[in-house]
Amino acid sequence: MRAKLLGIVLTTPIAISSFASTETLSFTPDNINADISLGTLSGKTKERVYLAEEGGRKVSQLDWKFNNAAIIKGAINWDLMPQISIGAAGWTTLGSRGGNMVDQDWMDSSNPGTWTDESRHPDTQLNYANEFDLNIKGWLLNEPNYRLGLMAGYQESRYSFTARGGSYIYSSEEGFRDDIGSFPNGERAIGYKQRFKMPYIGLTGSYRYEDFELGVTFKYSGWVEASDNDEHYDPGKRITYRSKVKDQNYYSVSVNAGYYVTPNAKVYVEGTWNRVTNKKGNTSLYDHNDNTSDYSKNGAGIENYNFITTAGLKYTF
């Protein structure tokens, strides 16, 4: 089913442009542009745990926050003909970046709105994050000073975190928030990875006035496949959790503004907002201490949103 959806969205621009006259494909310098930029990545990713036996209520949530991680971003686009373009783009962090993680549990079913256990981990690292994007565009309007087109593509993104040390407030069986303490500094507490795979559709356009140019791109997917891996390193509770969620929604808006310093070279700034909305999925766990495993349907939730700002150079060959 996923392959069928991907085939549909990837052929959409070709179908739209079928009214156009056939052009001979030619790999010439006039058909290619490339850009490179530097910037920052900020955002938050969330993992949730639900109990099906208690009506699917949320019993745990971990929020991983990161700010101003340095990234490098690049793209290349090839105009196959006046109505069709193909492109590849991607970005990656240039190193790890400090962040923060908060882990909360709601274990009292008689008072589900009040957390019973919480740990905070200010010594958290975004180890890495990256993304690649392959796309095709069908131009409905393609004039020297403005363009408007539909697009479709495939995109993957990855995030990796490690939380160390920190403090906790737990509730004992007899009390409420009565167990207070801290973890050893530098000791690994939790490692977490997320991965998002998605075919998408979108709308893109640009407008140029003299040497100034403004561009906007909107992307949407209802077919996101998300997966994660959560490693709890506590020797007394050494557990691995793995979750998968299908058919999540993804939204992205990108706005850029640039100035042509030469007929072929443009400097620009760009801001991109991305979000994958939360949805329940299946989860499994493996207890390394007693070698047991378990599986829960609709026992997990995965969510991510981030904002990217960059400044760079685009060159048309």
Question: Model segments located where?
Answer:
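Gram-negative bacterial Sec-dependent N-terminal signal peptides
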Residues: 1-20
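Outer-membrane beta-barrel biogenesis signature
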Residues: 19-37, 45
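Transmembrane beta-barrel strands of outer-membrane/channel proteins
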Residues: 34-42, 88-94, 150-158, 205, ...
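Post-signal peptide N-terminal segment of secreted/secretory-pathway proteins
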Residues: 73-77, 81, 85-87, 93
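Repeated loop/turn-to-beta-strand initiation elements of outer-membrane beta-barrel proteins
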Residues: 82-88, 143-146, 211-214, 263-269
